[in-house]
């Protein structure tokens, strides 16, 4: 009855009425791509006006499939276009493989917006600064550049330098490019993070970067190759906070868990000093592997540093899994079977028995 009064109908699941509903305003990586297409199709069958659908549609192939199935007339792809504004043009000209796909991390788009910062994109840092960085002028003095490290920073630096006309060779010590992205994608419901590495490898290929794997950059290599410039992008190592440690209690870091280098026991206490997605992700992974897990966070709440919708989706998942969370917790020390924490507000001790 209302169709005659409407120009179109837009299907979206988000609502500000609840935290769980707000997650769907800008659905994060944990939610399946194009997850509202089927519901939109149900509406489309009974409507005679144009139908829009949004919700994690991040690839042109997905949008085309939705249209071909008659599930909608228009697909909303806001973050996908922030990540790659040229996506429609690339698709039209048969360059789908060159599209930089959004991974729905929410870190620099809606995450920046909620913090009062200009919108950007972790995969496209020129977003929001197009006047300065959209069109980088070609170099008038080409150099031979050696990039040490095949993580995101090294790959982006190599791609930009090569696109400007420099002769660039990137060296990676291991067999795979990606750096810590290779670890991040191993956390529950974070597999799409690996898309950042895929996209950057494509950028390097298009720019003409030479890639050498399984080769660590050392002084001898630099002296042999004699580049004009070396870009050091060798990454980082896991942070271990200072704490008192006696006895034989097993203590490992997140990298060791993700690389399957450690076999934790039945009862595990995850100490999260960053309040991001690593600690909760490790806790979730261990619970799903059958361990009894508690999570202690060095902040006011779990996911304190995360974008709001990522945080709340993660909080809901941890609650469903029944993972106990202790906030305001700083690691103080451990012995044979006890972990000692300090409440960061009261200063009082908190003791966890093994």
Name each model-derived stretch.
Residues 9, 147-214, 272-313, 324:
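Beta1-alpha1 glycine-rich phosphate/pyrophosphate-binding loop at the start
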Residues 194-239, 248-249, 255-259, 263-264, ...:
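A Rossmann-like FAD-binding core segment of flavoenzymes
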Residues 26-32, 134-145, 183-195, 254-260, ...:
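Short, contiguous acidic/charged loop-to-helix segments that flank catalytic cores in large enzymes
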Residues 15, 235-238, 274:
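Short glycine-rich anion-binding loops that position phosphate/pyrophosphate groups of nucleotides
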Residues 11, 77, 230-233, 270-271:
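Redox-cofactor binding/interface segments in oxidoreductases and associated redox assembly factors
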Residues 19, 85, 112, 131, ...:
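Glycine/Thr-rich phosphate-binding loops of Rossmann-like dinucleotide-binding domains
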């Amino acid at each position: 009855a209302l169709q005659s009064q409407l120009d179109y109908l837009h299907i979206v699941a988000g609502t500000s009425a609840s935290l769980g509903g707000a997650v769907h305003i800008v659905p994060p990586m944990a939610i399946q791509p194009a997850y509202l297409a089927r519901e939109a199709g149900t509406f489309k069958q009974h409507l005679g006006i144009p139908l829009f659908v949004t919700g994690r549609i991040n690839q042109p192939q997905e949008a085309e499939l939705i249209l071909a199935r008659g599930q909608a007339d228009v697909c909303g792809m806001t973050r996908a276009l922030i990540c790659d504004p040229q996506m429609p043009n690339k698709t039209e000209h048969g360059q789908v493989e060159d599209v930089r796909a959004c991974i729905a991390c929410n870190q620099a788009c809606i995450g920046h917006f909620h913090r009062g910062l200009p919108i950007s994109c972790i995969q496209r840092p020129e977003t929001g600064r197009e006047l300065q960085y959209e069109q980088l002028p070609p170099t008038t003095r080409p150099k031979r550049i050696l990039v040490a490290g095949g993580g995101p920073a090294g790959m982006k630096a190599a791609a930009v330098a090569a696109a400007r006309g420099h002769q660039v060779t990137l060296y990676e010590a291991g067999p795979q490019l990606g750096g810590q992205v290779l670890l991040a994608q191993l956390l529950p419901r974070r597999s799409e993070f690996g898309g950042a590495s895929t996209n950057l490898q494509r950028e390097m290929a298009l720019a003409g970067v030479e890639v050498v794997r399984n080769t660590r950059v050392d002084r001898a290599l630099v002296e042999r190759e004699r580049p004009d410039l070396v870009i050091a992008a060798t990454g980082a190592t896991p942070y271990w906070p200072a704490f008192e440690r006696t006895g034989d209690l097993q203590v490992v870091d997140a990298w060791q868990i993700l690389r399957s280098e450690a076999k934790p026991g039945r009862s595990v206490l995850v100490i999260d000093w960053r309040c991001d997605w690593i600690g909760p992700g490790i806790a979730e992974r261990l619970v799903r592997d059958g361990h009894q897990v508690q999570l202690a966070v060095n902040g006011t709440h779990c996911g304190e540093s995360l974008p709001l919708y990522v945080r709340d989706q993660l909080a809901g998942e941890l609650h469903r899994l029944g993972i106990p969370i202790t906030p305001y917790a700083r690691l103080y020390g451990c012995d044979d079977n006890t972990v000692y924490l300090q409440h960061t507000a009261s200063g009082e001790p908190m003791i966890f028995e093994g």
